[in-house]
Amino acid sequence: MSDSDSDSDYELTLSANALAALEEFKREEQQHQEAFQKLYDETDEDFQKKKKEEGMKLFKEDWQLSQFWYSDDTAAILADAILEGADENTVIAIVSAPSVYAAIQKKPTNEIPTEHIYLFEFDKRFELLAGRDHFFFYDYNKPLDFSDEIKGKVDRLLIDPPFLNEDCQTKSSITAKCLLAPNDNSKTKKGVFKHRLISCTGERMSEVISKVYSDTRITTFLPEHSNGLSNEFRCYANFECSSWKFAS
């Protein structure tokens, strides 16, 4: 057999393997879509129960949208931090971090102090998670393109912009500043400062974060992702809590 024949056979084998992998991927996608569609057909009671139990397991990551879900522990810690000391009047926005929203929903009802918790997300699948009344379609390229009714009304905000570049971080910060109510150092009925801001993003974005959120500092908390992520992630916040302190 000539070298050219060997090369040709190798290319054919490689192509066959690639084709098989593609077909398997398509099958998995189809199965996932069918399972997802089934959720729409269930009664509201059945779905609410499943949503609480399954959380982010219902939603497959779309890497083209730079979707990387937090680990369960990380999502739970961030959920606790944003809820800590809130009362029934506290307004909370979760921006581009649906796994934190899912972690909040998993909590017992008596551990969720407010009904005013909203999800801002580009992926419209998550309207199913949050519900129509608590979901805002959000595209960071249009940072002010959402309902005026919530602008300047948010007391606490957690944001995890999808891309680790200055453009995305800066545009996302425009959204955050538009949503947040002025910080007047008022406290909730539980005696905790009402205003809180959390930004989770890559360590290499630290200079950008210090510029766009001048009142935040890097914390000791290290966010982790369920499927691993090569980029070092950090949590920036303008407050300390039971889960973290400001890093020295």
Curated annotation (Swiss-Prot):
It comes from the Eukaryota. GO terms for molecular function: nucleic acid binding; protein-lysine N-methyltransferase activity. It is an enzyme of class 2 (transferase). InterPro entries: DNA_methylase_N6_adenine_CS, Efm5/EEF1AKMT1, Mlase_EEF1AKMT1/ZCCHC4. Keywords: Cytoplasm, Methyltransferase, Transferase. Its EC number is 2.1.1.-. GO terms for biological process: methylation. GO terms for cellular component: cytoplasm. It is found in: Cytoplasm. Pfam families: N6-adenineMlase. Present with 3060 molecules/cell in log phase SD medium. S-adenosyl-L-methionine-dependent protein-lysine N-methyltransferase that trimethylates elongation factor 1-alpha (TEF1 and TEF2) at 'Lys-79'. Required for replication of Brome mosaic virus (BMV). Belongs to the class I-like SAM-binding methyltransferase superfamily. EFM5 family. This is Protein-lysine N-methyltransferase EFM5. It comes from Saccharomyces cerevisiae (strain ATCC 204508 / S288c) (Baker's yeast).
